[in-house]
Amino acid sequence: MEVSRFGLEFNPFLKNSKEILVETTQYREALFRLSYLAKTKGFGLLTGGPGRGKTTAVRNWAAALNPSLYKVVYSCLSTLTVSDFYRSLVESLGGQPSFRKPDNFRSIQEEVSRLCLEKKKTPVIIMDEANYIGNAILNDLKLLFNFEMDSRDRAVILLCGLGQLNNTLRLSVHEPLRQRLVMNFHMEGMTKEEGRAFIRAKLDGAGCSHAVFDEGATEAILNASDGTPRVLNRLCCQSLLCADAKKLDLVDADTVMQAINDCELG
């Protein structure tokens, strides 16, 4: 695709293109809640639909933490077995992993205490895609990070995932863990006004100061994306591709409808 047709230096809607961060209301609120969690320590829960910006918010928040004060550990629950999770956590915290769960439990608590009390660093344990987490790990977490001799939390444990994670934690068996949440935030989609600003900011970031999508095209994209940044990016990208194939300099509503069908969103 020749993006120069649209006055763009590059395609700002591609995932692997130069990142142009658009700070929506939900993004800023998520960062505010995460910053509060970092200060207070304890358990936090961040949920939202697919493509709502959870990973972007968590990644940027974690990257901004002072490495002299925080030790960030990231785990993706969709790719790890229960035993792999515990061994990976021990190793990431600086310990020696074992094949025995009790040994890994002890090592995790020892390493958290060592970082907190000796190194004066707060472990920040990010459990991404935590909607895949099993009841076994959820039951373990409240025990694993319960330091009886110290009433204060020694680590930040962030569960990040889809909305069904909230439903899981509402089960009575998980009430003790839910009561320990010091932060619970669900990311909603963008408003239409934010969606328009999102598109404009992306175009500006790619060196384009004029309109690329006409009003009908913009409205169609906003309706189909339902406020989800990932879907909006995908639709804009596919619409540009369709418009380029038709040698259009301005994307119209018919082209967006073709893009919606191509993306199987219609």
Region locations from a protein language model:
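A short, basic N-terminal segment
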Residues: M1-K41, M257, N261, G266
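Conserved Walker B catalytic segment
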Residues: F43, S113, K119-L159, S172
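C-terminal alpha-helical "lid" subdomain
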Residues: E2, R59, P176, E193-A197, ...
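Conserved NTP-binding/hydrolysis module of P-loop NTPases
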Residues: F10-F13, Y70-V72, L80-F99
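Short regulatory helix/loop adjacent to the ATP-binding pocket of P-loop NTPases
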Residues: A62-L65, L165-R180
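Conserved alpha-helical scaffold flanking the Walker A/P-loop in AAA+ ATPase domains
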Residues: R33-Y36, P102-E118
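Conserved AAA+ ATPase "SRH/arginine-finger" region at the nucleotide-binding site
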Residues: S75-T79, T168-L169, V182-G195
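Walker A/P-loop nucleotide-binding motif
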Residues: T40-N60
